[in-house]
Amino acid sequence: MKIKATIDRIPGGLMLVPLLLGAILHTAAPGTAEYFGSFTKGIITGTLPILSVWFFCIGASIDLRATGTVLRKSGTLVLTKIAVAWVVALIAAQLLPEYGIEVGMLAGLSTLALVSAMDMTNGGLYASLMNQYGSKEESGAFVLMSVESGPLMTMVILGSAGLASFQPHHFVGAVLPFLIGFALGNLDHDLREFFSRATQTLIPFFGFALGNTINLGVILDTGLLGIAMGLLVIVVTGIPLIIADRLIGGGNGTAGLAASSTAGAAVANPVIIAQMNPAFAKIAPAATALVATCVIVTSILVPILTAMYAKRMGNPMPAQHGASAGKEKMAPEMH
């Protein structure tokens, strides 16, 4: 059977197919991990440790000479994404009730839901797409995307200063595996080549684990509003990200479009913020459902749109990027 070849024909399939399988399992049998326990539970719920190892390998695969490119690319994408979410918050604050719409077709729509869906990029999805359609440096450009993680940026954008404190050691913890891998890969070329091979191997594993955090039933709960909001996230953040990538990041826009998704971790933001500020408690459940739907919609559409855009731009294969950037051997390309 040509299972791998079939998956390769699907845009972002190495990430998307396992993610959908995980979401189906989580929806149909949410207690599977607890029932079997042990190693099976580890594969189903191991998003964080799997991503940690993958993050280490990504760091090891990047040449020291690419540092400037990585920082410029990641800084451009992160700042653009946050700026867009901030502008959306300003506009939404003028058009929507303080704590969201409670009745009608738009019931559940709130500034909290919009900002939570737009200010965090799915770093794993972005990096896996760049591993296919970009360079290693672009794949590693999500090093600064950890700044977006958690409720901090959402709370700052919402004007809730003082309700949450940012602990520097949490940021250090987020980038430490990458930095250790980066150091080892640059100290020893053989280690760089060795760890680089694992970058693609781990993608379906964290895709499956991430899928097991998503319940497909949320689409039914939020209806067309959730789907429309997912499309809005791609359009509203994607266009500025493409422009910024072309004008500032030094790319052709592919990385910008690949960053126009909603992070799975963003689903937790409304509840966390509501715990810190009870005023948001009433709208947190609806906001959570909307953000979860955005995760599903963007996880499906962003790989497809990125593949179409990359083809239109005539992107070279990853191996060609790696040769021009670092003259080093790269992991087998993911089609």
UniProtKB/Swiss-Prot annotation:
Q: Return the InterPro entries for the record.
A: 2keto-3dGluconate_permease (IPR004684), 2keto-3dGluconate_permease_sub (IPR018395)
User: What does the UniProt function comment say about this protein?
Assistant: Catalyzes the proton-dependent uptake of 2-keto-3-deoxygluconate (KDG) into the cell.
Q: What is this protein called?
A: 2-keto-3-deoxygluconate permease
Here the disulfide bonds are none
The Gene Ontology CC terms held by the record are: plasma membrane
List UniProt keywords, sorted A-Z: Cell inner membrane, Cell membrane, Membrane, Sugar transport, Symport, Transmembrane, Transmembrane helix, Transport
Q: Record's family?
A: Belongs to the KdgT transporter family.
Q: Where in the cell is it found?
A: Cell inner membrane
User: What reaction(s) does this enzyme catalyze?
Assistant: 2-dehydro-3-deoxy-D-gluconate(in) + H(+)(in) = 2-dehydro-3-deoxy-D-gluconate(out) + H(+)(out)
Membrane topology (UniProt): Multi-pass membrane protein
